[in-house]
Swiss-Prot record:
One of its GO terms (biological process) is glycine betaine biosynthetic process from choline. This is Oxygen-dependent choline dehydrogenase. Belongs to the GMC oxidoreductase family. FAD binds at residues 8-37. It comes from the Bacteria. The keyword Oxidoreductase applies. The active site is at H475 (proton acceptor).
């Protein structure tokens, strides 16, 4: 394996953030970058990662998925729950559901209200969302037209259930929005997806890394499992990794950029001697710097599926039958169209379940077939389902390494559903969803409630169902939170620099101080775009002046 020993920057993790940094930093021809990825290439001929409709497949094996498990979750019947994370060029953008959702404007204004994060307002972040994006129907004040990330919008003629579901949400009294990433997130409407015009997954490997790979100043090493960051005193000076179980080293002249994501980044820091001193001493890890927030503040989104039989034969159930799949695959492969070219999450919404919330606290994804996210337990009959979950749970978890061995998975505990608010939100979510499915727009379609089943009505029954059946939405975050140095639990400052150390930044979803209202791929890419300008010493993009919606205490729904 040929790698030089010295680079300006070493990036750990070729995922949603790392590939953005690698691409932007190597635009400066005099800068050398080493990009380390524990997984393999993103094989372009592997339909499992490239076909949007095949999104369940990468979660089923371990080629593309770290397949972490939580410790027994105490409020979830002590279940050890899935915590899938992407492995390979593209990271989790190689295996995610491809929903292009940025979060609510108020999420970022909320971040910016925290000491030290003043330049993370929505209007500061919006130019970087736009910079990353090329939207298929063209740019506007909210969307970009020249970015590496391809975004596809739902089109007329898609499955009729999508429009019916949006209409039902409006009939139930909730707002309609024509763009969940535009002026107003709150309401029901079409959902954009990170898919190319030719119907392929638009991961950061395809969008960004394809631009950077030909550059002589970028070196990419796959199957490189990071062991630890190397320090000289309080300065990060390099990285040690394993390649075929053999230790390799490189040094960084300027900075080490940690982009491992919300599970891997705290692990790597802790193994490197940065984290809670008591934990590190108990594992005989030499302490470089005591930072109690490393691995703390862990957050995620939890979600439920509500599944219904479909009275009309218009769902995607036939696509699950093996004898129909060759034709679907051929149309996608040769034409880039058809069922295979969509992730099938083409409608959804964000609502407030109660006026106690200043911005939406529930997210909906609608799917015109009933099946688990990982492809298990498909319903054979015509059916559809709604995914619903709370967005800003007060529950907080933690990540602890178990040993110095980089091959050993960490101890992960989210403490899902550990607050009363969690239970109130999930009870409301299930009851509101049933109301939506009872509206006239869905009356021609909505049949028997398959799951949870109409017999479950009381709080106790709903709570028991949630404990047994709620699953992760695969949005782990916030485990190395941004904040002012005066906050003892903050790990990095507003520019991603690790407190108390030099030459080390974290750039990924772990630095979010609070999880955003929506999916995490688009915000993670934005964070990397924004911090790439900081690292390069460039003037930040001018703040946007686009207007955006605030509920300001408005009723959560219109009464009929």
């Amino acid at each position: 394996m040929s790698t030089h020993n010295e680079y300006d920057y070493i990036i750990i993790g070729a995922g949603s953030a790392g590939n953005v940094l690698a691409t932007r930093l190597t635009e400066d021809a005099d800068v050398s970058v080493l990009l380390l990825e524990a997984g393999g290439p993103d094989y372009r001929l592997d339909f499992r990662t490239q076909m949007p409709a095949a999104l369940a497949f990468p979660l089923q094996g371990k080629r593309y998925n770290w397949a972490y498990k939580t410790d027994p979750e105490p409020f979830m019947n002590n279940r050890r729950m899935d915590c899938g994370r992407g492995k390979g060029l593209g990271g989790s953008s190689l295996i995610n559901g491809m929903c292009y959702i940025r979060g609510n404007a108020m999420d970022y204004d909320n971040w910016a209200s925290m000491p030290g994060l003043e330049d993370w307002t929505y209007l500061d972040c919006l130019p970087y969302f736009r910079k990353a994006e090329t939207r298929d129907i063209g740019p506007n004040d909210y969307h970009g037209g020249e970015g590496p990330l391809r975004v596809t919008t739902p089109k007329a003629g898609n499955n009729e259930l999508f429009a019916a579901m949006v209409e039902a949400g409006v009939q139930a009294g909730y707002p309609r929005t024509d763009d969940l990433n535009g002026y107003q997130q709150e309401g029901f409407g079409p959902m954009d997806r990170t898919v190319t015009p030719k119907g392929r997954r638009s991961s950061t490997a395809r969008g960004y890394l394809d631009l950077a790979k030909p550059r002589p100043n970028l070196t990419i090493v796959t199957h490189a499992l990071t062991d630890r960051i190397l320090f000289s005193g309080k300065r990060a000076v390099g990285v040690q990794w394993l390649h075929n179980d053999q230790p390799q080293r490189a040094t960084a002249r300027r900075e080490v950029l940690l982009c491992g994501g919300a599970i891997a980044s705290p692990q790597i820091l802790q193994r490197s001697g940065v984290g809670p001193a008591d934990l590190l001493r108990s594992l005989d890890i030499d302490l470089v710097h005591h930072l109690p927030g490393v691995g703390a503040n862990l957050q995620d989104h939890l979600e439920m599926y509500l599944q219904y039989e479909c009275k009309k034969p218009v769902s995607l159930a036939p696509a699950l039958k093996l004898y129909n799949q060759p034709a679907i695959g051929a149309e996608w492969l040769f034409l880039g169209t058809g069922i295979g070219a969509s992730n099938q999450f083409e409608a959804g919404g964000f609502i407030r379940s109660d006026t106690e919330f200043d911005w939406p606290n529930l997210q909906y994804h609608f799917l015109p077939v009933a099946i688990n996210y990982n492809g298990s337990n498909p319903i054979k009959a015509h059916s559809f389902q709604m995914h619903v979950g709370s967005m800003r749970s007060p529950s907080r978890g933690r990540i602890h390494v178990r040993s110095k061995d980089p091959r050993e998975h960490p101890s992960i505990l989210f403490n899902y559903m550990s607050h009363d608010q969690d239970w109130r939100e999930f009870r409301a979510a299930i009851r509101i969803t049933r109301e939506i499915f009872a509206q006239p727009a869905l009356a021609p379609y909505s049949g028997r409630e398959i799951s949870p089943g109409s017999a479950l009505q009381t709080d106790a029954q709903i709570d028991a169902f949630v404990r047994e059946h709620a699953e992760t939405a695969y949005h782990p975050s916030c485990s190395n939170k941004m904040g002012h140095a005066d906050d003892p639990m903050a790990v990095v400052d507003g520019q991603g620099r690790v407190h108390g150390l030099e030459g080390l930044r974290i750039v990924d979803a772990s630095i979010m101080p609070q999880v955003v209202t929506g999916n995490l791929n688009a915000p993670t890419i934005m964070i990397a775009e924004k911090l790439a300008d900081v690292i390069r010493g460039r003037t930040p993009l001018a703040r946007s002046t686009a207007p955006y919606y605030k509920a300001n205490g408005a009723p959560v729904r219109k009464q009929g």
